[in-house]
Structure formats: structure tokens, C-alpha cells
From Swiss-Prot:
Compartment list: Membrane
Membrane topology: Single-pass type II membrane protein
Protein name: xyloglucan O-acetyltransferase 2
GO MF term set: O-acetyltransferase activity
Keyword set, alphabetical order: Disulfide bond, Glycoprotein, Membrane, Signal-anchor, Transferase, Transmembrane, Transmembrane helix
């Protein structure tokens, strides 16, 4: 039911509209010309480029609508003859280590599948529409090398619409910045193993021992210092957690993952994820220097598919087709960690700053079905013979679907 004040406002507005229509003929041609010119320049200065804004709106208006009640991450993979929008030769920025076809992978069936949610459709990635949505924005992928893998997929997809400028690379090629000048869009990566401050223990020869100390009371400043300049942050980190790690909160030692030491609290990997992600998401939510409308997308753990061993004991991932839904292990460590990550995100959204937006990119279950999507031995390995990559994803490949999800998420948050 409308309030009396709103009804009065609508009545007054209608009277004003009728008066304008009845008396418009009395206005001089000069006034009409001035009015049109004023309207044009108002639009120009307020919207900077009204023509581009209208073009962006037209592009987005033709995009399929997504049922907000549909769970995009529950479904299965179906054959798709179209394949990816790009090829291993059409995208110049694919690293050799992810360019599986270039490295000699003989099968190509893994390229011709798409994700189909149960009960709805996930629209195919549209680079023109995506760039329209993120015009003038800065997007940062924060995490380990799988986060970089994700960014590289998006970079290839967007390059089909506009060639980006490579404007920054650090000495170790871990942090990169790309710029799309026609859309004033910045795409970057910020490398971090654990998201929080970490230190590797060293022996008497100053050689790394593989033992890490994490302080969940301190965020890794390498990425967090750049957060105030970010509009959309895709946050993830996972694969460095599967090793001996001592977890601290300041001077207090909370326990250890994979240590089995006497008088030391044993922490499971999923509990370690809970402690880290709870601290990280809280810091993001409470970041006073960050933009009020900052969007944070938490990407859940991406599963590895080693068989007949691990990465350092000859494990492989040589399958050439997806798994069916019945092959998913709902009790796997990855699914437990996924649950822990999502619980921390839900906790923040329930009590968080309503201006800041949070969303989940839930790839764990989706990618458990794609043991065929990894480089395996086709990653240009010259120095580590016998080691197979069953963690990262071929480009092009199943990881491209993550950007179908990302586009849907950003559109829903608009």
C-alpha cells in the first residue's frame, strides 16, 4: 500500500507533466534548442561518454536472463561441438606450461564439453558483454598459481574482443597487470600462498625446510595493500595448505597441520582453512580504506586428480573424458574444505557490511568431474622429468567455464 506522501508526489508530478504538454507550444525555438543542448552536455559530463553507456546497455539487454533461484553449480557436463571461444594458437598470452596442445597432447575431446546446471542454463561467456559490465573497473585475482591460471583463461577470452596492454610484470613474473584501454578495464593478479602472513622455516644452511608458520592475525600485505584500489576481488588459495604448517594468532600457537608432534594440537586442513578464511574475509569486510561497493568473490578449492601416486611419486591424470555425477566423492578432503570455505563466507554475509558484496564461485564439485582437463605430462617440463601437473588446467579447457560462472555472478550483483 502506498503512503499518502508518495501518492501526493505522484499526483503533483502528473499535473506538472500535463502543464508541460499543454504549454510546450509557447516555448520559443531558442529555448528548445538550449534545452536540448543542455540535456546533451549534462549527459556527457555525468556519464563521461553517453554513447558508450548506451552501447553497453544494448549489449547487456540481449544477454539471457538467469533464474536467481537456480543453483548454477549443481549439474553435469554435456557435449558441446562449439568448443572454446579461443584456441591454443589464437590466444598469444597462454603460458607454455598450460598450452597442452602445443606441448603435444594428442586428444582434443576435453575441449568440447560445457557445464549444464540442473533446471536452467548457464549463458556462454560473452567477452563484449563482460567488458561492458566491468568498464572503468579494476579486477584482481588474489591467490596462488591456480588463481593465475583462472586469470589467464579470462585474459584469453577477453582478448577475443580487445587486445590488452601488458603494463606490469614483477621480477618473478608472479604479479601481472593487463589494461584494456577501450574499456578502461584493469585485470591483474596478486600472488600469495596462504592469504595471511607466512614464513618458511630454514635450516642451518638457510635452505627452506618446507615447514611454514602462518599468523592469521596479519594479512599478507603483498595483496591486501592493493585492495583499496580494487573494485572486484577474486580470492582463492588452497594448494599450499597440504604440508606441515604451524598456525599462530600473534604470539599464540593454535596448532599444526600435518605435524604429529607431541604436545601440539593437531589441526585438520579444513580447520586450517576455516581459521585462515575467517580472518581474511573479516579483514576484507572491515577494510575502511576499501571502496564501499567492493565485490569479493570467493573461489572454492579446485580439485587435483592425481592417480597411482602423488605429484612427487609418479602420480598421473591421463583420463580423456569427464566423470559422471556418480563418480563424485562427497566425503573427499576437497569437499570438506569447500564446505569450510562457504561457511566462513556465509558467516560474513550474515553479519557483514551490507554495502560490500560477497559471492561464491563454487567450482569444487564442478571440477571434480573433469579429471581430463589437466596438463598431466604435457606442460613443457624440462627440469622436472617424471613430474606431472594434475593441479592446473589446460588452456583452453574446462577452466574456461569458471568465467561463465564469473560473468553470471557479476551480472547478478549489478
Amino acid at each position: 500500500m502506498k503512503s499518502s506522501s508518495s501518492i501526493f508526489r505522484e499526483t503533483s508530478e502528473k499535473k506538472s507533466e500535463r502543464w508541460m504538454m499543454m504549454n510546450i507550444g509557447r516555448f520559443s525555438p531558442f529555448f528548445l534548442s538550449s534545452f536540448c543542448i543542455t540535456l546533451f552536455f549534462t549527459g556527457f559530463f555525468v556519464y563521461q561518454n553517453p554513447f558508450k553507456s548506451i552501447a553497453d546497455q544494448n549489449v547487456l539487454s540481449f544477454q539471457p536472463q538467469i533464474d536467481p533461484e537456480c543453483d548454477l553449480f549443481k549439474g553435469h557436463w554435456v557435449p558441446d561441438k562449439r568448443g572454446s571461444l579461443y584456441t591454443n594458437s589464437s590466444c598469444a598470452t597462454i603460458p607454455d606450461s598450460k598450452n597442452c596442445i602445443k606441448q603435444g597432447r594428442p586428444d582434443k575431446d576435453f575441449l568440447f564439453w560445457r557445464w549444464k546446471p540442473d533446471g536452467c542454463d548457464l549463458p556462454r561467456f560473452n567477452p563484449k558483454a563482460f567488458l561492458s559490465m566491468v568498464r572503468g573497473k579494476k579486477m584482481n585475482f588474489i591467490g596462488d598459481s591456480v588463481a593465475r591460471n583462472h586469470m589467464e583463461s579470462l585474459l584469453c577470452l577477453l582478448s577475443m574482443e580487445e587486445t590488452p596492454k601488458d603494463i606490469y610484470k614483477d621480477g618473478e613474473d608472479r604479479n601481472r597487470i593487463w589494461y584494456f584501454p577501450k574499456h578502461d578495464f584493469t585485470l591483474s593478479t596478486s600472488w600469495t600462498k596462504f592469504l595471511v602472513e607466512e614464513r618458511e622455516r630454514r635450516d642451518s644452511n638457510n635452505t627452506g625446510t618446507g615447514l611454514f608458520d602462518l599468523d592469521i592475525g596479519k594479512i599478507d600485505e603483498g595483496w591486501f595493500n592493493g585492495l583499496p584500489n580494487t573494485d572486484i576481488a577474486i580470492v582463492s588459495a588452497a594448494h599450499w595448505f597440504f604440508r606441515p604448517i604451524f598456525i599462530h594468532r600473534g604470539d599464540e600457537t593454535l596448532g599444526c597441520i600435518y605435524c604429529n608432534l607431541p604436545n601440539m594440537t593437531q589441526i585438520s586442513p579444513e580447520e586450517g582453512f576455516k581459521l585462515v578464511y575467517s580472518a581474511v574475509l573479516r579483514q576484507i569486510n572491515e577494510c575502511e580504506m576499501c571502496k564501499k561497493d567492493l565485490v569479493t568473490v570467493l573461489r572454492t578449492i579446485s580439485p587435483a586428480h592425481f592417480e597411482n601416486g602423488t605429484w612427487d611419486t609418479g602420480g598421473t591424470c591421463s583420463r580423456t573424458s569427464p566423470f559422471g555425477e556418480n563418480k563424485i566423492d562427497l566425503q573427499s578432503n576437497e569437499m570438506k574444505i569447500r564446505k569450510s570455505q562457504i561457511e566462513q563466507l556465509e558467516g560474513i554475509t550474515k553479519r557483514g557490511n551490507k554495502a560490500k558484496k560477497f559471492a561464491v564461485l563454487d567450482v569444487t564439485r564442478v571440477m571434480q568431474m573433469r579429471p581430463d582437463g589437466h596438463p598431466n605430462g604435457y606442460w613443457g617440463n624440462k627440469w622436472m622429468k617424471g613430474y606431472n601437473d594434475c593441479v592446473h588446467w589446460c588452456l583452453p579447457g574446462p577452466i574456461d567455464a569458471w568465467n561463465d560462472f564469473l560473468m553470471a555472478i557479476i551480472r547478478q550483483l549489478r
